Amino acid sequence: MSQIDDLPPLREVIRKYDLFARKSLGQNFLFDLNLTARIARAAGPLDDVTVIEIGPGPGGLTRALLATGAKRVIAVERDERAIPALEEIARRYPGRLEIIHGDATTFDPTPLLQGERARIVANLPYNIATLLLTGWLSVEPWPPWFDMMVLMFQREVAERIVATENDEAYGRLGVLANWRAETKILFDIAPGAFVPPPKVMSSVVRLAPRAAPLACSRRALEQVTAAAFNQRRKMLRQSLKALGVDPAALAEAAGVDPTRRAETVSIAGFVAMANRLIELKA
């Protein structure tokens, strides 16, 4: 695929606007239009969907989303150098691209959505990717304002997102992600597809929010998983002491063997312990 629209090639856009990637902003630009189109398609039909894109840079994925038929794209970009390039795309797709010059970590899109169907699709800046994902997974109330996320991460982070009990990568992020969403790694992207090429493989992950996750206080769940995984090699009867209650009694009340280690406990087990923690502290 040489072009998806009649706008200039991305390499020309980079030169025109002096948009060479900055490591300080976690930027790795994806120039391959086959791949940007594949990411856009992974988000499903978009003709009645508003897409939130974080860190669009020169706009390769932005163009793919619009060309694929997204009703509207709200692009949040911190790098002021990218704004003129994005404005050029907005002129090509009048009324369909809204550009927000700001910090994605503090951006709340809900006032702009007005009840519209929304999805988050992004090649996330690697230096804030986990922070952003954790924030989206922590939205209250749940289900959230978005019905899907299709996001690119470093492969190691992607493995942590989809991990479940007894997986080597299983940890706090995997518990939160799979408690609140169905997760799947869709495909990998090699370093050579990016400019500059990162040192590791990247992966595109889909997260579909669960309509009714197991009933639990998110804060209590975070407390339990933090205690358990901060000392992941220790048995729960040791690691859960940080919670300020009898750890063995907590685990047993939740139906979890207190001699188990965090990496072997299911999400349902952590939810049960979080619920018992609230009762014990009441």
Curated annotation (Swiss-Prot):
Q: Which reaction does this enzyme catalyse, per its entry?
A: adenosine(1518)/adenosine(1519) in 16S rRNA + 4 S-adenosyl-L-methionine = N(6)-dimethyladenosine(1518)/N(6)-dimethyladenosine(1519) in 16S rRNA + 4 S-adenosyl-L-homocysteine + 4 H(+)
In this chain, S-adenosyl-L-methionine is annotated as bound at N28, L30, G55, E77, D103, N123
What EC number(s) does its UniProt record assign? 2.1.1.182
Recorded GO CC terms: cytosol
Name where it mostly resides.
cytoplasm
Report the locations given in the UniProt record: Cytoplasm
The record, for SMART domains, names:
rADc
- A Gene Ontology molecular function term of the record: RNA binding
- Top EC class, one word: transferase
Give the keywords, sorted: Cytoplasm, Methyltransferase, RNA-binding, rRNA processing, S-adenosyl-L-methionine, Transferase
Domain of life of the source: Bacteria
**Membership in a protein family:** Belongs to the class I-like SAM-binding methyltransferase superfamily. rRNA adenine N(6)-methyltransferase family. RsmA subfamily.
> Matching PANTHER family, A to Z?
DIMETHYLADENOSINE TRANSFERASE (PTHR11727), DIMETHYLADENOSINE TRANSFERASE-RELATED (PTHR11727:SF7)
- What is the role of the protein in this entry? Specifically dimethylates two adjacent adenosines (A1518 and A1519) in the loop of a conserved hairpin near the 3'-end of 16S rRNA in the 30S particle. May play a critical role in biogenesis of 30S subunits.
Q: HAMAP family recorded for this chain?
A: 16SrRNA_methyltr_A
Q: What is this protein called?
A: Ribosomal RNA small subunit methyltransferase A
Write the lineage as a comma-separated list. Bacteria, Pseudomonadati, Pseudomonadota, Alphaproteobacteria, Hyphomicrobiales
